[in-house]
């Protein structure tokens, strides 16, 4: 059986944690930042976690993570 391919887009966006979850960046931090509050931008800086319903899909895209 051939090796499974890693989804390269997903590999650049998600990192596996020690407990089996996936870290990702928050959305809404690229442009049009002047109207967003400092507090909102500060909270978007922290790493986000992939939600439970999406874990299986992300795991399938990253078979060797």
UniProtKB/Swiss-Prot annotation:
One of its GO terms (cellular component) is cytosolic large ribosomal subunit. It comes from the Bacteria. InterPro entries: Ribosomal_bL35, Ribosomal_bL35-like, Ribosomal_bL35_CS, Ribosomal_bL35_sf. Keywords: Ribonucleoprotein, Ribosomal protein. GO terms for biological process: translation. Residues 1-10 have a biased composition (Basic and acidic residues). PROSITE patterns: RIBOSOMAL_L35. Residues 1-24 are annotated as: Disordered. GO terms for molecular function: structural constituent of ribosome. Signal peptide: none annotated. Belongs to the bacterial ribosomal protein bL35 family. This is Large ribosomal subunit protein bL35. It comes from Tolumonas auensis (strain DSM 9187 / NBRC 110442 / TA 4).
């Amino acid at each position: 059986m051939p090796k499974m391919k890693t989804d390269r887009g997903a590999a650049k966006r998600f990192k596996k944690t020690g407990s089996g979850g996936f870290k990702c960046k928050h959305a809404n931090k690229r442009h049009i930042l002047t109207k967003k509050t400092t507090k909102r931008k500060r909270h978007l800086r922290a790493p986000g976690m992939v939600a439970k319903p999406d874990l299986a899909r992300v795991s399938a895209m990253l078979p060797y993570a």
